[in-house]
């Protein structure tokens, strides 16, 4: 059984720690110090880093962690080749923490953004998918991002979704503006407000929940997705 913990970093990042026994791996370390604190507090051994894409708020802690843990195994796509020692691509399967981990093409936010799906149960998706939202399409390749979302829609509804940012309340506000008759969104807003008031993460979400509240997953075609994404960019 994997234990998954959110390590807050920067303003709104989550570094996800995936633990089995005393061994732990992390996803997208924005900073090193919060990870060091987590490891010391829980007496854990860091062995592996997974990187979804090259943006600084996802790789900023790598050098500091490597300085202390020089034998780290670091996985990522070609766009982060300078930071990793194992390059992976969509369709690859890794065996980590006694689990099958599938590498999923999640392009759009960046050209070679990837996600990691553990045991068909846990999706670590970086900035490709947020609760009630998705990442900005910095590449300009809206087709790629739309295709990424279609892939996520095919995952089991019970799949837990672990994005890299706490954007849920802002995203739900936008979602409510474009889907004003969606009761699921209003209920999600109330839950998220309660959690944030208690300084708790709103994440993980599930694919089932995202299909109900995420306007980008409800876009029926590319043109509709582009319209929504451009509206959100200006929101």
Curated annotation (Swiss-Prot):
Binding site for Zn(2+) 1: 53, 55, 109, 127
One of the protein's GO biological processes: methylglyoxal catabolic process to D-lactate via S-lactoyl-glutathione
Bound cofactor: record note: Binds 2 Zn(2+) ions per subunit.
InterPro entries: Clx_II_MBL, Glyoxalase_II_hydrolase, HAGH_C, Hydroxyacylglutathione_Hdrlase, Metallo-B-lactamas, RibonucZ/Hydroxyglut_hydro
Protein residues bound to Zn(2+) 2: 57-58, 127, 165
Keywords per UniProt: Hydrolase, Metal-binding, Zinc
Cofactors demanded by this protein: Zn(2+)
Annotated metabolic or biological route of this protein: Secondary metabolite metabolism; methylglyoxal degradation; (R)-lactate from methylglyoxal: step 2/2
Its EC number(s): 3.1.2.6
A GO term, aspect molecular function: hydroxyacylglutathione hydrolase activity
Homology family: Belongs to the metallo-beta-lactamase superfamily. Glyoxalase II family.
PANTHER family named in the record: HYDROXYACYLGLUTATHIONE HYDROLASE, HYDROXYACYLGLUTATHIONE HYDROLASE GLOB
Protein's name in the database: Hydroxyacylglutathione hydrolase
Annotated organism of origin: Haemophilus ducreyi (strain 35000HP / ATCC 700724)
